[in-house]
Amino acid sequence: MAYFIDRRLNGKNKSAVNRQRFLRRYKSQIKQSISEAINKRSVTDVESGESVSIPIEDINEPSFHQGRGGERYRVHPGNDHFVQNDRVDRPQGGGAGGSGQGNAGKDGEGQDEFVFNISKDEYLDLLFEDLALPHLKKNQHRQLNEYKTHRAGYTANGVPANISVVRSLQNSLARRTAMTSGKRRRLAELEENLLRVENSEPAQLLEEQRLRNDIADLRARIKRVPFIDTFDLRYKNFEKRAEPSSQAVMFCLMDVSGSMDQPTKDMAKRFYILLYLFLSRTYKNVDVVYIRHHTQAKEVDEQEFFYSQETGGTIVSSALKLMDEVVKERYDPAQWNIYAAQASDGDNWADDSPLCHDILSRQILPVVRYYSYIEITRRAHQSLWREYEHLQATFDNFAIQHIREPEDIYPVFRELFKKQAEENY
């Protein structure tokens, strides 16, 4: 009876290499599906995996086939309905499958979209691919770590794509040498004895036959030692190492005034949740300062920032003044990379908008690496947007974006934090 022992600890990931190849090959279609799917999630469900749909025509392999139309000559099996040279009506053409939208029809056939699941890590990797904090500078004190993949020797477990052929063959040779060295020494002794018996007088036929049987048995046992075994396999090991970069702080300023209705607040929260996930996944030890404001600004913790029901009028400058105070108290611009993301519906007391312009231009923008303003509204822009447009024309580290619908959130987020070319700062 034969026994098969599977020593692979990663047997469930035997097709991981094919999965990674598929994700690379259809990355653009997968990212498009992810950007559509994120808009359908609740505010608190941004971090789990996702079921991804790809149109079947996008993953079809190229092939040569007969086009529709034209004249064709085929040989069909004979039957009692047709004879030689009869003309056969062309069959009805089938339509392509799709998402299920459209009207019903009696003819045609097709295929549904290809649907598969991606894990949480794959989802977040694709979600934040090619994003980075703009103008990040290495300051004197380094506490912010950015994770990068490095080679880290070899491991006994891994995916087939990372197998080290040379190291595996070295292990195979060492194992076969260790397992057969005693047998080969014994084989050499038996062959020497056989040669002596064959040349002896008188002939010792029984002893000669015994030696030949022992030699054949040893050779068979040596041959049964496998050339390569799963025990020999070694895989290139990779690990993520924290590389010192610069310490950074992100200020999150959210308008919670009475003009911000619940759908608008939800869109602002979605944006900030994306920002939080991006920072926590890409960097380590990033400080985040949460500021909520209506007529008064208040520094709060994460729980209160996302779930507090407090509301009131609108004075945007109160949040900017509080941010300026916190920077002066805790975050020296010479030691910190300072970032800010402000979300509002643009509704502000008219006399306060010029004050916001002055605070930003004189106190905040000269010391921050990047300041982004997101206006969430379906209405026409008001005085705050116009003041910020003047700032954008003057300062390279100031950006403004407009969100009208939930589906605008992710494209705006990527536009604000897309990787830029290396710059000297």
Curated annotation (Swiss-Prot):
Compositionally biased residues, Basic and acidic residues: 68-90
Chain segments carrying region Disordered: 60-111
InterPro entries (UniProt xref): UPF0229
Biased composition (Gly residues): 92-105
Pfam families associated with the record: DUF444
Similarity comment: family membership: Belongs to the UPF0229 family.
Name of the protein: UPF0229 protein ETA_15540
Originating species: Erwinia tasmaniensis (strain DSM 17950 / CFBP 7177 / CIP 109463 / NCPPB 4357 / Et1/99)
